[in-house]
């Protein structure tokens, strides 16, 4: 089960090396209100969360010794930076970065607590920029003033233009930064920027060492993209398939419930490609037309609900539709003309009650009309209230003892009812989280699942990844840092 939590996506499995590459981290999404303390934000429905000017959790700032800055991850020397909220790269971008360089001024990005490079390996940088007057920029990956890789470009023209370059590292370094400097000074508007390693798994854009770790575990399916991020805390932050496909710079960024923005470089296409590369069955979780019920839920109604239902149907078409279909054509343009596999659809995440059942039924009926082969999964036992149910997702988080005492939990389950998917399971309470004692409790419970696999057909530990510098949930299965 993969969810973008603990910065597991950007800067993790998706190896973007620049944090806040879209310059939007400090921009409040629609439906959020900044609080007077300058740290918290509140949704219009009343959910309070830490924001910390877009840095996320305050403990991340303190624990990682992140210097204060107006625009997260970006710092200036002999230069002035400010967000441009009108003249952006495209309709999906909420901000651009306006730079005014003095002579020998510079702009620096510190990455996800450092940028990691290996001697002899190459890295691809691209940016979109425009300038009223021609301006020369030197780009370098550096550490304490020492240039590890460098290149240069000249920006000209008053329309956004894409500039590409290669940066080849001269030596290893795990605490580097990216610096853009301007010898003569001048003004430039940056619309989007990205720095990625050329070495990715099978050339498909994901971090090689992390995918190899997954491959070594022989996974049979992957549930994606969440998790609570599917629900969001406002209609604007609810996940929509269409926001996660197409060129990276045209995907709108999204503030996740786990306190940070993602640029959605790890999107629907990338998940499906990963499933294909590792032989995993895709299990897509769609938003069912409501935000997180544990975070002051908002219900979508009318056209907004219809739009969300259609988004799910469009996602399925993208995955398995012909290349002549609307969304199949986009898939083909992304390099995959043949259909992917699409095995399972989970309708909602951790949703319940009459409001959920209404929305579940809408999506279930539409999907079965068009794609009867898709296996659907419900969040609760909707069959008890007369709804059709093929499979139900049950989540378990508790103590070691809780799991050890439930080895026989599924022995007496009704074999005439729906199948069971244990979609999230982990010891996350007590004194032994992430230790052998906890693992023994989890193993005991999983043994009980194995002996009842006639009804429990799928199971997955949760969550999968943690970037060790950005912990929002503990424990996880695998731990990562900027350096492989």
List where the protein language model places each region.
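Structural recognition of the beta-strand scaffold that forms the well-ordered cores
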Residues: 1-2, 220-224, 282-285, 343-347, ...
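Extracellular and organelle-lumenal recognition/adhesion modules and their flexible linkers in secreted
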Residues: 1-264, 281, 296-306, 350, ...
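Conserved, mostly hydrophobic/aromatic
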Residues: 127, 218, 275, 315, ...
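Active-site cleft segment of glycoside hydrolase catalytic domains centered on the general acid/base Glu
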Residues: 163, 204-205, 294-313, 328-374, ...
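An active-site-proximal structural segment forming one wall of the substrate-binding cleft
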Residues: 204-219, 268-274, 304-339, 399
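Short, solvent-exposed turn/loop segments enriched in Gly/Ser/Thr/Pro and often Arg
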Residues: 223-235, 286-290, 380-382, 461-465
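Catalytic-core region of carbohydrate-active enzymes that cleave or remodel glycosidic bonds
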Residues: 368, 372-375, 391, 395-470, ...
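Conserved small/polar residues in nucleotide/adenosyl-binding loops
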Residues: 479-484
